[in-house]
């Protein structure tokens, strides 16, 4: 078969390929990752004309789409672990999509791939139709341009090439001259041979008719004279010896010039090789910098994606997780500092209460504010509710074990010590989850145990000192001193958002003797309630106690007790199961940082609030 026939046959085979129909348009509800606050949200997705668009709902399509991407250069990646999820990325834009089930996901992926294959970028037939002749021609032209330009750059090399051109002209002329000389010699020799044969024939006839040797001897001189005119000593005025010397000198000059040219080319090659090595090294550094920049850019563009948040298959490593959490906490601290300074500047000065002063006017009387329930209500035996037994057990356990000194216990580590405050921790892990019990002791002047526990338990002032809560509400009021609270904590990316459902109860434990003060305690422990089921947040489990004892130093003389004479000894214990998949090192670092800050912030708040109020024992 000829080339033309084979070409035509291959072309006909391509023409006979069945053409696929237009891609199928598809629309429906898919879950799309919006951001780390709202998470997955159902969206109406429309696929047509090589474009994927999404709307908030099917009813709002007439208001226009909320976003769209062209599928020509899109990369569709099914998720490795989540069978219902697939990602669509175009440059730095990434859509995270979840279908109802694996079959639903596969149908969407097939439809998207079909639209993509029909575009100019994804079609293989389009790549076959557009051959690579342009690149071949451009490569050939660039090669020829490089070859010619390299000879134009060296001035010495150009001069040597001119010398080679001159030597070539000289050598051609010398070859022509020598060729002419050799042709003349060849013609002369041929003519001499003919005349020599004729003379020899005449001589043979003469000797045959005159057999006398004297004639032969005398005729030899005549024969030498006969051939003198054909001697090629100087043909056409050509000096053979001179031409030979000149030819030798010309070839020697050519060889010398060639040697010089080769030397110049070797030097030039070395120079260009050094420049090439420098350019290769420069390109390597640029490519490395570009790769690092693209990696950082990709991280930033996907920073809020679901693959980079807390989870069993999170792509973020432990160090990056800690850095992100620490950066988020630092931002929150700055915001809290600005808000607290702004709030203090707007606080009105508390007017002094005339009833709260003695005749001397320098000390506060022991008087309970109207907003606080009297102690008799808090220890009333009529405190009946369904969690009463659990509350009593918790109070008894904390009074028995939480007040024990752990300073000499080898299982407890002193992690923070700032003035009167000491924070201890005992490392405990269960199934990879950090369950470290924490115990802190602190001593605060100018406040009583009742005041500290009252502000810690009272939900009306919770937002004044608690900065980690996003929102909370009382689910059920069990009794005057026991409530069930549901609260959601602020999200600290990349950690998942957490919520807590707990029972909070306040108690006063009477002193064993008249010389001792009563002990106040607030117990917060996790419970279940139908009105607060599990949701998208990670439900944490807690068992926390704030135990406060008041110490009084007698004033001099008959003076009344002032806040300068009182001191509150605080014991704070916390057993928290955070749940989720946060790294253990991150949880321990955050606990070490946040618990001391909480104690200092809360006790300072109580001191500020009670400074101008009567003492509440």
Swiss-Prot record:
Listed under GO cellular component are: endoplasmic reticulum; Golgi apparatus
Q: Which Gene Ontology terms cover its molecular function?
A: lipid binding
Keywords assigned by UniProt, alphabetized: Coiled coil, Cytoplasm, Endoplasmic reticulum, Golgi apparatus, Lipid transport, Transport
START domain: which residues? 383-611
> Which GO biological process annotations does it have?
ER to Golgi ceramide transport
* Annotated domain remarks: The START domain recognizes ceramide and mediates the intermembrane transfer of ceramide.
Q: What does this protein do?
A: May mediate the intracellular trafficking of ceramide in a non-vesicular manner.
- Which PANTHER family does the annotation name? CERAMIDE TRANSFER PROTEIN, PHOSPHATIDYLCHOLINE TRANSFER PROTEIN
Q: What is the protein name given in its UniProt record?
A: Ceramide transfer protein
- Gene name? cert1
């Amino acid at each position: 078969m000829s080339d033309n026939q084979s070409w035509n046959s291959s072309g006909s085979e391509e023409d006979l390929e069945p053409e696929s129909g237009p891609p199928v348009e598809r629309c429906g509800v898919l879950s799309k990752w919006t951001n780390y606050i709202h998470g997955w949200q159902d969206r109406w997705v429309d696929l047509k004309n090589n474009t994927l668009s999404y709307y908030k709902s099917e009813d709002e399509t007439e208001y226009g789409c909320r976003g769209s991407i062209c599928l020509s250069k899109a990369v569709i990646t099914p998720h490795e672990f989540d069978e219902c999820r697939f990602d669509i990325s175009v440059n730095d834009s990434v859509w995270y999509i979840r279908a109802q089930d694996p079959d639903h996901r596969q149908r969407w992926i097939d439809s998207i791939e079909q639209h993509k294959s029909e575009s100019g970028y994804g079609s293989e037939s389009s790549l076959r139709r557009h051959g690579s002749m342009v690149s071949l021609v451009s490569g050939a032209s660039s090669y020829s341009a490089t070859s010619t330009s390299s000879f134009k750059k060296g001035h010495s090399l150009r001069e040597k090439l001119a010398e080679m051109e001159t030597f070539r002209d000289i050598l051609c002329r010398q070859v022509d001259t020598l060729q002419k000389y050799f042709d003349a010699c060849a013609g002369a020799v041929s003519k001499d041979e003919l005349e020599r044969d004729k003379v020899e024939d005449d001589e043979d006839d003469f000797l045959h008719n005159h057999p006398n040797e004297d004639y032969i001897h005398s005729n030899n001189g005549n024969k030498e004279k006969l051939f003198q005119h054909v001697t090629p000593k100087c043909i056409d005025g050509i000096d053979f010896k001179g031409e030979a010397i000149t030819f030798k000198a010309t070839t020697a000059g050519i060889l010398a010039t060639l040697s010089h040219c080769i030397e110049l080319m070797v030097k030039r090659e070395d120079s260009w090789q050094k420049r090439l090595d420098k350019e290769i090294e420069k390109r390597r550094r640029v490519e490395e910098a570009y790769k690092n920049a693209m990696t950082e850019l990709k991280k930033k563009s996907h920073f809020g994606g679901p693959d980079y948040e807390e989870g069993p298959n999170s792509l973020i490593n432990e160090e990056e997780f800690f850095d992100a959490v620490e950066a988020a906490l630092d931002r929150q601290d700055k915001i809290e500092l600005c808000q607290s300074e702004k709030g203090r500047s707007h606080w009105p000065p508390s007017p002094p209460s005339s009833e709260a002063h003695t005749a001397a006017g320098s000390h506060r009387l022991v008087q309970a504010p109207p907003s606080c329930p009297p102690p008799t209500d808090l220890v009333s035996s009529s405190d009946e509710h369904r969690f009463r037994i659990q509350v009593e057990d918790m109070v008894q356990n904390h009074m028995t074990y939480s007040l024990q000194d752990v300073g000499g216990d080898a299982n407890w580590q002193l992690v923070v010590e700032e003035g009167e405050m000491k924070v201890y921790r005992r490392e405990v892990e269960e199934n990879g989850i950090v369950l470290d019990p924490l115990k802190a002791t602190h001593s605060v002047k100018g406040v009583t145990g009742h005041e500290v526990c009252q502000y810690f338990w009272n939900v009306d002032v919770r937002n004044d000192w608690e900065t980690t809560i996003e929102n909370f509400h009382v689910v059920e009021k069990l009794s005057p001193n026991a409530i069930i609270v549901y609260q959601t904590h602020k999200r600290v990316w990349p950690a998942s958002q957490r919520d807590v459902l707990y029972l909070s109860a306040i108690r006063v434990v009477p002193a064993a003797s008249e010389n001792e003060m009563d002990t106040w305690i607030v117990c917060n422990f996790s419970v279940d309630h139908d009105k607060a089921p599990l949701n998208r947040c990670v439900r944490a489990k807690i068992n926390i106690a704030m135990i406060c004892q008041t110490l009084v130093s007698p004033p001099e003389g008959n003076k009344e007790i002032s806040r300068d004479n009182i001191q509150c000894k605080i014991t704070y214990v916390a057993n928290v199961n955070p749940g989720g998949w946060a790294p253990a090192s991150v949880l321990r670092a955050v606990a070490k940082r946040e618990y001391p800050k909480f104690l200092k912030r809360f006790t300072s708040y109580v001191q500020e609030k009670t400074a101008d109020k009567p003492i509440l024992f």
